[in-house]
A protein has these predicted regions:
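C-terminal motif of bacterial Sec signal peptides marking the signal peptidase cleavage site
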Residues: 16-19
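Functional surface patches built around histidine and acidic residues
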Residues: 2-3, 21-156
Length: 156
């Protein structure tokens, strides 16, 4: 049963990540969901944190790691750190209570941000850190160097 679950999860992840390509035609089967491909580089954009954590969980499943649960407190921490990052342009320091913190800047969508993390060896290891809860946030500052700043925090 575990092999079937892993195969299904890997298939879902492959389909989801296929949507990270630059294809700009009409929606097709397997296209990335709007919540993952919505541009965050505009005022009042709203991140679908459940879908974002779902994509991270699909990746974790391919590495035999348990899923993360979205946590309101960690979302608040992530938002405070993302806002600080967007205002100062300086990467925030990981609070000691966190298991892991991943940062990114400049990517307009979560799909692109996730692909950047997944394709960087150190960030990919961080995505599968032994944690049980997650918070994710994005902040937009059009006058800053990168415009958009992402923070993922993992905890227990």
């Amino acid at each position: 049963m575990n092999k079937i679950h892993a195969l299904l999860t890997a298939s879902f992840l492959a389909i989801a990540l296929a949507g990270c390509s630059s294809f700009s035609g009409p929606a097709s089967p397997g296209a990335l969901s709007a919540g993952l491909s919505a541009r965050m580089d505009q005022p009042n954009a709203t991140l679908d944190s459940q879908q974002a954590i779902g994509l991270i969980n699909a990746y974790r499943a391919t590495r035999n790691m348990p899923p993360l649960v979205a946590d309101a407190g960690l979302n608040g921490t992530a938002q405070a750190l993302a806002s600080q990052y967007a205002q100062t342009g300086t990467a925030p320091t990981k609070p000691q209570a966190l298991v892991q913190m991943k940062l990114s800047a400049g990517y307009p969508t979560f799909a692109e941000t996730f692909s950047g993390w997944r394709n960087n060896a150190a960030d990919a290891v961080g995505l599968v850190a032994p944690a049980s809860k997650a918070g994710i946030a994005v902040a937009y500052n059009p006058t800053s160097s990168y415009g958009i700043y992402w923070v993922l925090v993992l905890g227990n």
